[in-house]
Curated annotation (Swiss-Prot):
It comes from Escherichia coli (strain K12). Keywords: Cell inner membrane, Cell membrane, Membrane, Symport, Transmembrane, Transmembrane helix, Transport. This is Putative transporter YdfJ. One of its GO terms (cellular component) is plasma membrane. Residues 1-7, 50-74, 119-132, 179-225, 273-279, 329-351, 395-427 are cytoplasmic. It is found in: Cell inner membrane. The chain crosses the membrane at residues 8-28, 29-49, 75-95, 98-118, 133-153, 158-178, 226-246, 252-272, 280-300, 308-328, 352-372, 374-394. It comes from the Bacteria. YdfJ may constitute the C-terminal portion of an ancestral gene disrupted by an insertion of the cryptic prophage Qin/Kim. The N-terminal fragment may be ynfP. InterPro entries: MFS (IPR011701), MFS_dom (IPR020846), MFS_trans_sf (IPR036259), MHS_symport (IPR004736). Belongs to the major facilitator superfamily. Metabolite:H+ Symporter (MHS) family (TC 2.A.1.6) family. Its main location: membrane. The gene is ydfJ. Residues 96-97, 154-157, 247-251, 301-307, 373 are periplasmic. One of its GO terms (molecular function) is potassium channel activity.
Length: 427
């Protein structure tokens, strides 16, 4: 919820509150830049808290990360504006965004690791999809709050004080999440492996992950989902409103409806992956995004279509290119990595993919759309991200129901057993 609150704020109002002296296009690019700053911080947070999670446990790290994110999100709601303190306003905004990003870097990976290690074989996909459903619930809540603000407030009221309400209201979610995690038990897989006290169970050196085929495949899988998420949920909403002058209710209402439908899409994909494996659903969803990107975008940006038609097109591409892939992401990555490095490698692969694809994607989309004066770069980037996700899915091994206590990563060559030569028997 915290990141979606910010992403919609960056797309819809921050350009006027924190960058009012820039042109419309440049202000949107700068606002997307503050969005991207959080993704840079997420990599650092993924490394720090991922290593901690593999050493001291999943539970403690999840408590730390949710607290960091919640406090920063609430503080954004009390920031002074550019009109009040000038350039220090965006500086403070970026500072809070970076601290928020540090916690976010291990938040979803930690939750995904925890649920995967709790779930029994045969039900990991559906159970792990609860992480995506929780994130989707946050997206829905954030979108609903912003939509409500746009509905009840005038533009002047929204820019004067209304934009603060979504961030201040997040304190309720933070308190509940902290209470929930204080009462959480540690992952049984983590306890089992660490109780064994085996020398071979020590975490591998941090640099070794970059030699892992599983690490790069996971990063590629992340491109398809995270890149499309940044373009569709963040940039496209701002592009429709600021550049094409659409009613703000069109993208916010469409994303809200899409998030509601996601409560069917996400568990269905999780259940399906328990039946037919992780690879095939990944291949289907990425292929669908590639095929649908151009026709759906051509409808979304065309004002000659009815608002309902535009919203349907946005809902379709969002479910195929974002929510469907997110349903598969956490369990697939958890099963791809060995138990002693799972948290670290899952978090860093997700955040590297997120930084490159989603963190910088909206900025590049803004630049390319301004240069070309068209929506074509958005569709091309969605297809490109989905192609990377598709190739990664085709190359990855099937990891469904893999032993989560295994030390090695799934895509690595299995160690060969060298048998000692047997002495020949004398006749």
């Amino acid at each position: 919820m915290d990141f979606q609150l910010y992403s919609l704020g960056a797309a819809l109002v921050f350009h006027e509150i924190f960058f009012p002296e820039s042109s419309t296009a440049m202000a949107l690019i700068l606002a997307m830049g503050t969005y991207g700053a959080g993704y840079v911080a997420r990599i650092v947070g993924a490394f720090i808290f991922g290593k901690m999670g593999d050493r001291i446990g999943r539970k403690k790290v999840l408590f730390i990360t949710i607290t960091m994110m919640g406090i920063c999100t609430t503080l954004i709601g009390v920031l002074p504006t550019y009109a009040q303190i000038g350039v220090f306003a965006p500086i403070l905004l970026v500072t809070l965004r970076i601290i928020q990003g540090l916690g976010a870097g291990a938040e979803i990976s930690g939750a995904g690791t925890m649920l995967a290690e709790y779930a029994p074989k045969g039900k990991r996909g559906i159970i792990s999809s609860f992480v995506a459903m929780g994130t989707n619930c946050g997206t829905l809540s954030a979108t609903a709050i912003w939509a409500f603000m746009f509905f009840i407030l005038s533009k002047e009221e929204l820019l004067a004080w209304g934009w603060r309400i979504p961030f201040l209201a997040s304190v309720v979610v933070m308190v509940f999440a902290i209470w929930l995690r204080m009462n959480l038990k540690e992952s049984p897989v983590f306890e089992k492996v660490n109780d064994s006290n085996q020398p071979t169970a020590k975490p591998a050196p941090a640099g070794s992950m970059f030699q892992s085929k599983s690490f790069w495949l996971a990063t590629g899988l992340r491109f398809g989902q995270a890149g499309n998420s940044g373009l569709i949920q963040t940039f496209l909403a701002g592009y429709l409103v600021q550049t094409l002058l659409f009613n703000k209710a069109i993208p916010t209402d469409a994303l809200m409806i899409s998030s509601i439908l996601g409560f069917m899409t996400i568990p269905f994909l999780g259940w399906l992956s328990d039946k037919i494996g992780r690879r095939i659903p990944y291949i289907i969803m990425n292929t669908s995004a590639i095929v649908l990107a151009w026709p759906m975008l051509s409808i979304i940006v065309d004002k000659s279509y009815a608002p309902s038609t535009i919203m349907v097109a946005l809902i379709v591409i969002h479910n195929c290119a974002v929510l469907g892939l997110f349903a598969l992401e956490n369990i697939t990555m958890a099963e791809m990595f060995g138990c002693k490095n799972r948290f670290t490698r899952m978090a860093i692969s997700k955040e590297i993919g997120g930084l490159i694809a989603s963190g910088f994607g909206p900025i590049l989309a803004g630049i390319f759309c301004t240069m070309t004066e068209s929506w074509y770069p958005i569709a091309i980037m969605i297809m490109a991200y989905s192609v990377i996700g598709l190739i990664s899915a085709l190359k990855m091994p099937e990891v469904k129901d893999r032993d989560l206590s295994a030390l090695e990563d799934a895509a690595e060559d299995q160690p060969r057993v060298v048998r000692a030569a047997q002495p020949s028997r004398s006749l």
